[in-house]
Amino acid sequence: MITRLPGLLSRATNYAHIVDTPDAWAMVTDIYSSVYWLAARHRWMDLAELAVIKQGLAAERATPLAGIIAVRDEAGTFLNSGDFEGGLAVVDRAVVHAELSMEGREKALGLGLLHLRGLTLAGRRRDKKEVERHMAAAWRMVEEFPQDVDVCGMQFGPENTATHVMATWVDLEHYRRALNVAGDLGRRTLTLPATRIGPLYMNAARAKLALHDRDGALNSLVDAWEASPQMAKVSSTSQELLRVLISLHKRSNPTLTKLAKQARVGI
């Protein structure tokens, strides 16, 4: 994907300049969103921030939903840099704008995506009041989507909302709550893509490790690698979990040794 994006972006941008329609510019914002996502996963932060700036410029000519996704990614740069308060301010401004300018299912989808980003930011900030506000709002938007939908690579619905809730409970150190959510999800046949299933297992591993369940944490980390190996390889969460598990295991563990080799982490 990394090798294909430059050419795809060039062609989409040229096309958007020729036809100059909101849908054409929405394609450009979608590609920049992919650039941002990949750059953030690899921790190429300068590229991630540049992609979001370009995405925002394209979004000025694009569809309202493309604009929502651009704001969501902009707030993501604040999340990546640790400026959770700044990210929440970006989200809140976008929520107000969406409430006034959008309608129908598209409005519910846009607001849902924004509130999930706000939920993550509030959890990292450990602001329980903001967590409750964004969580409640996200679940209200889910009422419009009984099944998860994928729009421009963004998922929204009951499953993806639950994965965000679970991650936030881990951030707030409510580990049992997090694992209860994971257990509920585990009893379903999930429709989410691998890029969402992988983090679900990683967060389960975080919760289990915090509860001193080393074997359970390792099993969940293995599940994350099996669900999304490319993501697990570059994820800072996966890398940190692996290092901690290596430090805790006094005896050789074949499963841990295999994961360390895949991740190129020394034992």
Give a label for each model feature:
Residues 1-267:
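Conserved binding/catalytic microenvironments
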